[in-house]
Amino acid sequence: MSLEMDLIEWALNLRAAGGGVFGSGSEELDRVLKLHYRVTYHAFDRGTKRSVWEVLLAEAEKIDSSKGMELEQAVMGNVFGILYRQLGDETECARWLAKLGALRALRGEYPEFWALLLLENVCYREAIGVEDQQQVFRDVARLPKETHTLTWFYLERFLARVQCERWQAVKEFGGVPLAYLLEAVREEEGVDQWLLEQGRAILSRTRFPAASEKNSTMLEEFHAVLNYYLRKNNKPRSTEWEGFITDSLGVTFQSVNVSKAALTYYRRFGDTKLALLNLLNFFNYSERFRRMNNGFYDDIVSLLDAYTFVLQLTSLPEAIGDIFNKAKAFEQLRNILQEFYRDYRLQQIPKEHSADWLSNSAKVVVPPKLARLLSDSWFLLYRIERNSLKPTLDFSLTYYLANAMCINPLNIDVKFHYAYVLASIRRIDMCIRFLKTNILNIKPADYRSWHLLALCESIQEDKDVSFKIVCSVLKAMAEAHEESNLLKADKWQFIHIKLTQLVLVKEMFGVKDALEMLSEVYQLYASLFPASKVNKTKDESRLGPAHNQTKEYLFQAIWFFSARLFLQDGDAQNAREAIDEAKRVTDTFTNLNVNITHGYLKLHCDPKGAMSEFQNALSFDPTNVDAVVGLAKLLYPEDQGSLERIARHRPIIGTATPKPESDPFANSKDRSAAVAQLKMLLENCIEKSIDGYHTPEVWWYLSRIYDEFHDNERLESALWQCIKFHELEPIRDFKYCMF
C-alpha cells in the first residue's frame, strides 16, 4: 500500500472516530472531511441556530465535489443532506442523500468508512425502507471497531429504527453480526437465552484454526456482540455465559474479541482476579498487533475502555504474583490515553496551564460514547492519585480534571473535584472564581460547593462573607430537608456546614457563644438520622462500606468536635465526658480520634499519658497531622506564644496549652531520641501527606528542629512555608466538604 493511500485511510479512520484534524495528503479531501466534522459537531449541539446551518451550507456550496474523487462526492452528498435536513428542506435532503447509492464501489475500497457514510445516510432519511435496511445488513459485514465511535453513534440510531418482529432478525437479514446486535440492542424478554442458543450454535460449527488459518470470523463477531450486550446495562445476565466464553477460548488463538468479552463478563460478575487476567491477555494480544502494524493499535478505544472498566473496581489488589501490578496497570492506562490523544489529534490542556481553567479552557466535541469514556478515564486517573502529595503539587490532578472537563463540560462532580484540588493547593482566588462561574451559576443547590466557597472565604481576616454564606446555605438545606429533598451525602454535608458555622462563631464571637449553639448540632443529627432498627449493613445513611462512611462515625465526629470546644474553653471535665460519649457510640470499629483527643486532654496534666496516646495513633497512621503536632507540643511546650503569633491553630489545637506540670522525658537522651523521631514524622508529613504539607504547625515545628540542629538553610525555608500556609489557612480543613 502506498504512503498516500495510508494517509487517506488514516484520515478516514480519524473521521470515523469522530476526529476533526486530518492530514490525508489531499487538500481537497481534508477540506471535505473538516466540513463534515463541523456539520456533525453542530448536529450534536441541539441548540445550534439556523444562521449557523446557513453559513455551513454556503461553505459547502463553494466546494465543487463533482470534479473530485468519488470519496469526496460521497462525503459531500451526506453533508448537503444533513444541512438541508437541518434547514427543513426535505426534498433537497432526499436528493442529496440518494447520491450515495451510485457510489457503492467505495465499499470495496474503504469498507469501514463506507459503513459510516451508509449508516449516517440512512439515519438522516425521513423513512427507512425494507431495501435500505437490507442493504445496511449486507454492507456492514462486521461490527465497527470501538474506536469508530461516530460509526457506532449512527449504528445505534439505525438499529433503533429497524422494523422487525422479535427473534426474526436472523431469518429476515441472515446470520450476520448486525442481526444478533439488533436483538441485543432491543433486549426484549428472553433475549439472554436466545443469544446464548445462537452463540452455542456458532460455537458448535467452530474448530481451532490451523497454523495457516484465522479464527472463526463469525465467532469473533458474536463475541463483539456479547461484549456490547454485557456492557449495555446492569440487568442480570445468565451465568451460563462463562461456559460459553471458556469454550470459545478453547477454539480460538489469541482472540482479542473473546478476551474482551471474558474480562467484561468477570468484571460484571465480581471475579476481580479473572477480570484482571483477561485484561492482561487482551492487552498482550493488542500489543502483538501493534508491534506488527507500525506501532498502531487496531482498536485503541476498545483497549482504553477495557482498562477503564476493569480498573474502576474498588477492590483491586496491589499485585497478583508477577502477573499483575496495580501501579503498572494505571501507568499503562495513562500511556494508552495519551497515545489516543496524540494519534487522533485531540486537543489537551497541558499540565502547566491546567490550574487556570478560566484562561485555558477548551471544548473537545466527540461522539457521546467516546466523550463518556475519555471523561471516565481522566477521572479514574485522578481518583487513583488524589490522596498522593506529588501529583497534587505537580498539577497532575488539575491536569486530569481539566481535560475531563474539556470532554464533558456538564459534569458537576468533575467540576467540584477540580475546585477542591485548587483549594487544596491553595489557589484560593482561582477556586473562588471557578466555583462562582462554573458551578454555582449553573447548579445553585450544590451545597458542597457553597461549603467549599465558605471555607475559601474564611481565609480572609474578616469572616463576615464566610459566615453569611454558611447561614444562607443552612437555611436552604433546612428547607430542602423539610421537603425530603436532601441526598445522602447532602445530610453529611449539612452536619459539617453546621460545625463550620460553630467554628466561625467561635472565631468571631468567642468559644462561649459556640458552646451555646452546640445543642443545635445534636438536634440536627437526630432529625437527619433518626434512630431505626434497620440492620446496619443495610443502613441507607451509609456513604459506603468503610467505617468512616457510617453515621456512627459521623456522630463520633460531633462528640470529638464538642470535646475540642470544651478544651478550648478550659473545661476538661466536659471534654472528657464528650470523649467517653464518642467511645460509647459504637464498638464495631476503633476510632483513632479517641486517642488523639485524649492526648490533647492530657497534654498539661499527664504528659506521659498524652505521649502514649499520640504514639498509639501514630503506630496506625504515621502521617496523622493532629497526632504529630500533639507530639511536637510535648517536646516544645514553651513555643505556644510564638506559634500563636505565626500560625492560627487548627480547631483541635485551640488556644495555647500551659506548660506541662511534669516532663514526659526521663532525661536529655530520652528527649533527643524523641526529637529525632519527631523530625522523621514531620518530614514524612511534608513528603507524603497533603494535609501535612499545607499545615503551618508542621512547618513551624520543623523549623524548631532545624534550629536545634543548626540547619539554617532548611530553617529559613520551613519558616517561609509556615508563614505562607498560615496566610492561606481556612477556618476548617477543606476535606470537610468532600463526601
Swiss-Prot record:
**What does the UniProt entry say about where the protein is found?**
Cytoplasmic granule; Cell membrane
Cellular component GO terms, alphabetical: plasma membrane
Q: Report membrane topology.
A: Peripheral membrane protein
What protein name does the entry list? Cargo-transport protein YPP1
Task: Spell out the PANTHER family in the cross-references.
Answer: TETRATRICOPEPTIDE REPEAT DOMAIN 7, ISOFORM A (PTHR23083:SF464), TETRATRICOPEPTIDE REPEAT PROTEIN, TPR (PTHR23083)
Residue runs in coiled coils: none
Q: What does this protein do?
A: Involved in endocytosis.
Q: Which InterPro entries match?
A: Endocytosis_PI4K-reg_protein, TPR-like_helical_dom_sf
* GO BP of this protein: endocytosis
Question: Which family is annotated?
Answer: Belongs to the YPP1 family.
Coarsely, its chief localization is: cytoplasm
